[in-house]
Amino acid sequence: MKVFILALLALAATTAIAQLETTCSQGFGQSQQQQQPGQRQLLEQMKPCVAFLQQKCSPLRMPFLQTQVEQLSSCQIVQYQCCQQLAQIPERTRCHAIHIVVEAIIQQQSQQQWQEPQQQAQHKSMRMLLENLSLMCNIYVPVQCQQQQQLGQQQQQQLQEQLTPCTTFLQQQCSPVTVPFPQIPVDQPTSCQNVQHQCCRQLSQIPEQFRCQAIHNVAEAIRQQQPQQQWQGMYQPQQPAQLESIRMSLQALRSMRSIYIPVQCPAPTTYNIPLVATYTGGAC
């Protein structure tokens, strides 16, 4: 598996700043055996997170590896930008904004791909986008557009530019795309954002005192699945870079449905995980 699954998530669980000898919380202290859910149970709950981190998103730049991945934006970051832009659009205009995005996507598709009238395909795609973007961004989008509202050409162009991240996200960043365009099969039942939603939901259901351990388990599971040769050539970053990465990771995790994650989240003494991670910026 390629190195693209490395970035910053496990980093938030492995705060390698001379704190690896402490525990995630008091729940992992002397009463650990009585209070802590089983490692396998936590990992089972976090399976969507593992799947999301490993398979669903394109790579992020990893400054801690000698081999740089030049793509600056991952699936999650573009998704987050999409949600931000959509949230800034007035509620009464969101349906039209999404309609413009769909039309732009359809226009970019080869005409040979369509076996049904373009208007019907457009309506179908718009319905799918309405459902998925409402869930993905956790904001209200009307089910039906108010067709009597007329938008000028300049306003339409402005909306299309404003939702460029959404277009990028839907076309390029996830596998598979959530909108099943004609003749483009969707083989996997879950899309990137759906798996991320499951990940958020599972994480929110885990008691606060065990979330550090749960995130740590995800990091450990991902690390164990990596071929050993992928870890060669890694160098230890300087402490300021570590601190900045940890801060970004914790901030991103806390933004996921406002899930509380302790600011101090060191790894248990029994798990001395290397400094590797996957970053999941973006809202659920």
Curated annotation (Swiss-Prot):
Signal peptide boundaries: 1-18
Family: Belongs to the prolamin family.
Record has Signal as a keyword: yes
Provenance organism: Triticum aestivum
Keyword Transmembrane helix recorded: no
UniProtKB keywords: Disulfide bond, Seed storage protein, Signal, Storage protein
Post-translational modification: Contains disulfide bonds.
GO terms of molecular function: nutrient reservoir activity
Pfam family of the protein (one): Gliadin
Function: Seed storage protein. Might be integrated via inter-chain disulfide bonds within the glutenin polymer.
SUPFAM superfamilies cross-referenced by the UniProt entry: Bifunctional inhibitor/lipid-transfer protein/seed storage 2S albumin
Official protein name in the record: Avenin-like b10
